[in-house]
Amino acid sequence: MKKKIGLLVMAYGTPYKEEDIERYYTHIRRGRKPSPEMLEDLTERYRAIGGISPLATITLEQAKKLEKRLNEVQDEVEYHMYLGLKHIEPFIEDAVKEMHNDGIQDAIALVLAPHYSTFSVKSYVGRAQEEAEKLGNLTIHGIDSWYKEPKFIQYWVDAVKSIYSGMSDAEREKAVLIVSAHSLPEKIIAMGDPYPDQLNETADYIARGAEVANYAVGWQSAGNTPDPWIGPDVQDLTRELNEKYGYTSFVYAPVGFVAEHLEVLYDNDFECKVVTDEIGAKYYRPEMPNASDAFIDCLTDVVVKKKESVM
């Protein structure tokens, strides 16, 4: 009989319906309810992208497809997928409890974020491992980062190339690629967090692969807190690149995210487009990985490599 291995797929989570927004936001704010103004602002953002984010559906599809693919590419072990979310049910701890109840003794934990940071990957895996230790007889093997995975870089190289191939030579000369990820508080840099360096590396790999000479790294979707967050913000960067170098076509690659959701559909497709419209420039944004076969193949390689290194 094949050994059963847990596949713990973790992600940020998103409201399933408008009524969930307040409790979701309260969880993000560690139990502090948002003010009516803050709640209204977030609700309006969701309404602007069609009422609710497609993220919940995409995340589940990614996880299910990954489980299926892992069981197709090898027959030594049988992977069982469990979904654990940071800010809404099914919570990470609930997924770990379910694994334990099912008699799983080893699990590979994959966060749907390519870059490592203490705020994201470390906290997700930490929560899972803490719960597993409480329950006993369950070891969780966390994947730190997978931004260097060749198929991940290739996904974005192909996506960027598909945008540039539709441009004339003249437009290409005046085009710039902005590679971005979710901003985090600046204090992580002083703590030696590798997150900013990993994004810079990712941008270099993609630009090299796609043969794009003009590119820059930006940060987006910063939180509404008094602490300074990593910059430059993509909107400010857009204006600056236009003023300084006269770029008239902007290609946004939000590579820190793996799916279409609020941060991409609103912060890029709406807020960045407002800026490009204002300066008379063209706006482009390649398709997100979502649950595409190419992306699922990438994640499959990531999990298989981790499993081989620890078991």
Swiss-Prot record:
Query: Where is the protein localized?
Result: Cytoplasm
Q: Which EC number(s) does the record attach to this protein? A: 4.99.1.9
Q: Which PANTHER family match?
A: FERROCHELATASE (PTHR11108), FERROCHELATASE, MITOCHONDRIAL (PTHR11108:SF1)
* One GO cellular component term: cytoplasm
- Pathway involvement of the protein, from the record: Porphyrin-containing compound metabolism; protoheme biosynthesis
Q: Which SUPFAM superfamilies match?
A: Chelatase (SSF53800)
This enzyme catalyses: Fe-coproporphyrin III + 2 H(+) = coproporphyrin III + Fe(2+)
Fetch the NCBIfam families from UniProt. Answer: hemH, PRK12435.1
- The name on file for this protein is Coproporphyrin III ferrochelatase 1
Q: Where does Fe-coproporphyrin III bind?
A: 12, 29, 45-46, 53, 124
Q: Does the keyword Iron apply?
A: yes
Matching InterPro entries: Ferrochelatase (IPR001015), Ferrochelatase_AS (IPR019772), Ferrochelatase_C (IPR033644), Ferrochelatase_N (IPR033659)
From what superkingdom does this record's organism come? Bacteria
List the GO biological process terms. heme biosynthetic process
Lineage per the UniProt record = Bacteria, Bacillati, Bacillota, Bacilli, Bacillales
Per its UniProt entry, what is the enzyme's top EC class, as one word? lyase
Protein purpose: Involved in coproporphyrin-dependent heme b biosynthesis. Catalyzes the insertion of ferrous iron into coproporphyrin III to form Fe-coproporphyrin III.
Q: Which UniProt keywords apply?
A: Cytoplasm, Heme biosynthesis, Iron, Lyase, Metal-binding, Porphyrin biosynthesis
